[in-house]
Amino acid sequence: MATDPSQYKFNHSMLRVKDPKRSVQFYEFLGMKLINKLANPDAKFDLYFLAYDSPKAVSHGNHWTDREGIVELTHNYGTEDDPDYKIANGNTDPRGFGHLAISVDNIQAACQRLEDSGYKFQKKLTDGKMRHIAFVLDPDSYWVEVIGQKTLEETESVKETDTASYRLNHTMIRVKDAEVSLNFYKDVMGMQLKRTSENEKNGFNLYFLGYGAPTPEASANGANPLAGSEGLLELTWNYGTEKDPNFKYHDGNAEPQGFGHICIAVDDLEAACARFEEKKVNWKKRLTDGRMKNIAFVLDPDGYWIEVVQNEKLKARSNW
């Protein structure tokens, strides 16, 4: 069977966490549901998969491999009791991973709810010049951006927020060379460039990529046209990094650890990996390597890990 990249899904983003109880509680407070847990007591780690799953959710009721917008939390046993164990969130040196982002119905009310519950903010809505976004901190100080599905003016007097309408909108990573990374994610991974935001004054550009139908560049009410989506990858490029031969971003898997990988679910795992081989990708783990024959890992141009798994709805392969 051939493989069709238009059938791929940006399935999840993996973060290591110190204390899974606290972290699961936080993401559940954001409206997510624990849709799967893979316990690995022999190897002393557990995996928690959280996603939006209300009747209003994009992937309501779907198998975990047939979704976009999942957060995978990895817990290595014992870290919760180690006073010296600390996660690297990617936003202090060494930098790399930037943030997750949720889109919400009424951003002012959503941020107030988070603040009222005692969660800390890296940036409140009212801080700085950018009054349309906020960043809340999860229990390990990973940044979670909060963006609105409507304009600020539409929601400024609304006091309620419905977490069932939220989306896990995107995952942001920093890249050294925008042209190289865009070519990789489009040509090799089969994503489409859905939106570009150029910030010449501040010396950086943002690129939003994803699978599925093309998205319009503008919306009628001026809100972000991608805010209702899930499964977007945001690449942040700071001008000039591509010219520095010694410049390198941190992949999150070397020490100090934090972010682990992004994952795509494909229509046919063997055929997809054969196509990646033809594209001459750098492998972290081929499908046939090691004991786990149901996952592969590709390296992107910055060395970030991309897990590849079978979408079990399209072809049953593993009993996850």
Q: Over which residues does each language-model region extend?
A:
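Hydrophobic, helix-prone linear segments
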Residues: 1-75
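Short, polar loop/linker segments at the starts of domains and inter-domain junctions
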Residues: 83-92, 245-253
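Active-site/binding-pocket entry motifs
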Residues: 56, 76-80, 152, 215, ...
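Amphipathic alpha-helical segments
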Residues: 18-34, 113, 177-193
